[in-house]
């Protein structure tokens, strides 16, 4: 095994209370279930989660919501997980709802080292509250700040021992993106291949972005 190979129970050494975690996937598809479960089992709390949605009660990052491990949430959609809505209304979770495209670009900006992005999305709505507005060529834009995280957890359908990754269909959602914007990136890989077995033109996330690999099996 390479130095990037991480046993699941060794994930705990990268976790601490109050940390920020980005996650890939869409409605739980493409979210690394084993990594989520290990985070839950570790007992860490007061987490900030950044990702597209909170999936369902027992899917994706849902178990972290249900078991009161999350303090803050930056996401686009919470409607399929009723526990998220309940905890938001009760004041148990601070939820920042962000339009999906804006969320993606804020993460991308964080990964690219940019100071933010300008978008017309949300101008004239509650989304603009507390944000700087900039006018360019007669059109108003919101300045949206970049997003970064302590770790990103992603799920790949296959990858090699160096950490080059490929995804399957819609399971690709947000996974390559969050890998750009975290200090430490941990990938759950279903099919782990020897170096050279993954064709270069299939690689979506290059090994340089991956710190650790955890086998799904």
UniProtKB/Swiss-Prot annotation:
The keyword Zinc-finger does not apply. Its EC number is 2.8.3.8. GO terms for molecular function: acetate CoA-transferase activity; CoA-transferase activity. Pathway: Lipid metabolism; short-chain fatty acid metabolism. It holds the Pfam family CoA_trans. It is an enzyme of class 2 (transferase). It catalyses: an acyl-CoA + acetate = a carboxylate + acetyl-CoA; acetoacetate + acetyl-CoA = acetoacetyl-CoA + acetate. Coenzyme A transferase which is involved in short-chain fatty acid degradation and catalyzes the activation of short-chain fatty acids to their respective CoA thiolesters. Belongs to the 3-oxoacid CoA-transferase subunit A family. Heterotetramer composed of two alpha subunits (AtoD) and two beta subunits (AtoA). This is Acetate CoA-transferase subunit alpha.
């Amino acid at each position: 095994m390479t130095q990037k190979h991480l046993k699941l129970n060794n994930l705990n050494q990268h976790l601490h209370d109050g940390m920020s975690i980005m996650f890939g996937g869409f409605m739980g598809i493409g979210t690394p279930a084993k990594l989520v479960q290990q985070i839950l089992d570790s007992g860490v709390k007061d987490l900030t989660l950044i990702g597209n949605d909170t999936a369902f009660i027992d899917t994706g990052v849902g178990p972290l919501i249900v078991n009161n491990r999350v303090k803050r949430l930056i996401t686009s959609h919470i409607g399929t997980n009723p526990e998220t809505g309940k905890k938001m209304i009760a004041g148990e979770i601070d939820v920042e709802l962000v339009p999906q495209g804006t969320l993606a670009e804020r993460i991308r900006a964080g990964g690219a080292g940019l100071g933010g992005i300008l978008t017309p999305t949300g101008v004239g709505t509650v989304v603009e509250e507390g944000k700087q507005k900039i006018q360019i060529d007669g059109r108003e834009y919101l300045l949206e700040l970049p997003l970064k995280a302590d770790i990103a957890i992603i799920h790949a359908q296959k990858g090699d021992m160096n950490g080059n990754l490929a995804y399957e269909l819609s399971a690709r959602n947000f996974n390559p993106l969050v890998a750009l914007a975290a200090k430490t990136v941990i990938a759950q890989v279903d099919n782990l291949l020897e170096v050279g077995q993954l064709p270069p033109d299939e690689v979506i996330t290059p090994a340089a972005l991956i710190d650790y690999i955890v086998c799904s099996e």
